[in-house]
């Protein structure tokens, strides 16, 4: 099982809060002790569910991603990839959870359709009576605007291209540029570009060498790049205030009520902000080449076969993989910082000090370890060989690597399957598995993803206690057809239990009557 970094930390923090204990007061080491206590008490629930369902496994071989040997492998791989320049630190736009105060993966972001407002705002043209109107759902980000983009084919704005617009209230001028990202059919056709707070805008900013102005603190409040009267306000309070000001200035043209998709953190249920922060990344583009070739050569195949196309689409358009998380529970990144910011990556402090002594020669230095931990998927990506004793050439590794079949859900093909293929092909020069069997997801009776926040979680142990393991197994197997998710409910299990009861009764009748 994996250590589920963010999810586990969130649960333990909530439990401590009930006892009025603040993790920041007890400190990192004490908090990690509390997490281990919770893990020992509750962490084997998944294994218990599998056992009750009747899975026939060698349970003596169970492994955990935070086990000592697994942790050593994680450190070795990080150092090896860093030394090959496949891991690096950079400042990029990431999904930022302002509640948990950490970067999160795309998998942990849920796009919820919500009722929103689209604000049409007039920007004055410098040294002119002309105006250009843009439409945005996030007017508070005006403080970080770097340009206004229009489509090169949109003749309505040809006379304005190259001129400067004045950001209302902010009173800073920005250039009107041409970029194909601007859609003439969307909004007004003119788009405000805020590279520090939107992934698409970030790409436009890079293409056009625009200034990147971050206006948010990590808790979602306006920072010192904001304007007077807004600094320190929560982003949503800033939005309310800026709308009032725009109305008073008579430059808010109109407001449309719309439905749009907004990113939420699946753990915190808070709105996710694209935020420019320093993080650690894996050069996934370089590592993706071998897995693509592995699938093309059919050394690894997908069933159903249609998932092969999805795999190619993901891998051929892969972005750098953000592997750092600003939490305490997980594999702490093996990097040490000197007083001047110089980074030394090593398997332990002693080795880092050797590197630092060599670099600084006779100068004094002090090393402080990176506080971030690794994305849980990083250690999970090493699972096929780390659990078999790698880097030692053990009998288990020779016998079970590559394995024959991996069974998994489609939702983690990219986050887990692809990354296992990356690491296996790079470190062992061979695919970790020959076949990938992609199964359906178990959802609630309405087809919704199960989550504690929705209150729609169905615990298999409760179903087994009420109906027995066989009816639940029969239900899941009967409904698990390729390409269709399982809509699970108690009524479904009741129906299959009743059917099995009839089969059992018929069997008993035959036995009692000595039927052959």
Language-model regions: role of each:
Residues 157-162, 228-240, 248:
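A glycine-biased structural micro-motif
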Residues 165, 266-270, 371:
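Active-site cores of enzymes that catalyze phosphoryl transfer or operate on phosphate-rich substrates
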């Amino acid at each position: 099982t994996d250590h589920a970094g963010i999810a586990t930390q969130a649960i333990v923090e909530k439990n401590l809060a009930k006892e009025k204990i603040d993790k920041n007061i007890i400190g990192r080491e004490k908090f990690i002790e509390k997490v281990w206590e919770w893990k020992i008490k509750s962490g084997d629930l998944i294994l218990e569910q599998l056992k009750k369902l009747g899975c026939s496994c060698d349970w003596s071989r169970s492994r955990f991603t935070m086990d000592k040997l697994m942790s050593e492998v994680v450190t070795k791989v990080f150092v090896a990839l860093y030394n090959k320049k496949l891991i690096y630190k950079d400042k990029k736009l990431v999904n930022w959870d302002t509640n948990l105060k950490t970067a999160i993966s795309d998998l942990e972001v849920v796009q919820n359709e919500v009722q929103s407002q689209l604000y049409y705002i007039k920007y004055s043209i410098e040294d002119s009576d002309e105006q250009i109107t843009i439409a945005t759902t996030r007017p508070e980000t005006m403080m970080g605007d770097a340009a206004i983009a229009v489509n090169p084919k949109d003749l309505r704005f040809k006379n304005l291209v190259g001129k400067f617009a004045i950001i209302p209230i902010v009173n800073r001028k920005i250039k009107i540029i041409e970029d194909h990202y601007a859609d003439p059919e969307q909004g007004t056709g003119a788009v405000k570009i805020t590279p520090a707070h939107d992934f698409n805008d970030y790409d436009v900013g890079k293409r056009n060498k625009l200034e990147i102005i971050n206006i948010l603190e990590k808790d979602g409040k306006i920072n010192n790049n904001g304007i007077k009267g807004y600094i320190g306000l929560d982003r949503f309070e800033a939005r309310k205030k800026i709308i009032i000001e725009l109305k008073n200035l008579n430059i808010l043209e109109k407001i449309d009520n719309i439905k749009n998709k907004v990113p939420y953190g699946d753990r915190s249920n808070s709105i996710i902000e694209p935020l420019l922060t320093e993080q650690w990344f894996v050069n996934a583009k370089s590592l993706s080449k071998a897995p693509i070739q592995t699938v093309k050569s059919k050394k690894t195949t997908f069933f159903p076969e249609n998932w092969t196309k999805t795999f190619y689409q993901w891998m051929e358009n892969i972005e750098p993989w953000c592997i750092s998380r600003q939490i305490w529970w997980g594999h702490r990144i093996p990097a040490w910082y000197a007083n001047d910011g110089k980074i030394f990556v090593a398997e332990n402090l002693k080795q880092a000090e050797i590197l630092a002594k060599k670099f600084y020669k006779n100068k004094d230095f002090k090393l402080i370890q990176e506080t971030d931990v690794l994305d849980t998927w990083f250690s999970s990506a090493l699972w096929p060989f780390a659990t078999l004793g790698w880097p030692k050439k053990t009998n288990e590794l020779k016998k079970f690597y590559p394995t024959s079949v991996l069974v998994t859900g489609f939702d983690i093909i990219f986050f887990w399957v692809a990354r296992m293929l990356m690491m296996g092909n790079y470190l062992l020069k061979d695919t970790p598995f020959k076949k990938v069997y992609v199964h359906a997801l178990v959802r609630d009776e309405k087809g919704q993803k199960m989550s504690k926040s929705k209150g729609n979680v169905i615990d298999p142990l409760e179903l087994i206690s009420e109906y027995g393991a066989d009816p639940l197994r029969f239900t899941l197997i009967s409904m698990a057809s390729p390409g269709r998710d399982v809509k699970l409910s108690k009524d479904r299990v009741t129906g299959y239990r009743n059917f099995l009861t009839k089969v059992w009764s018929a069997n008993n009748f035959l036995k009692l009557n000595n039927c052959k």
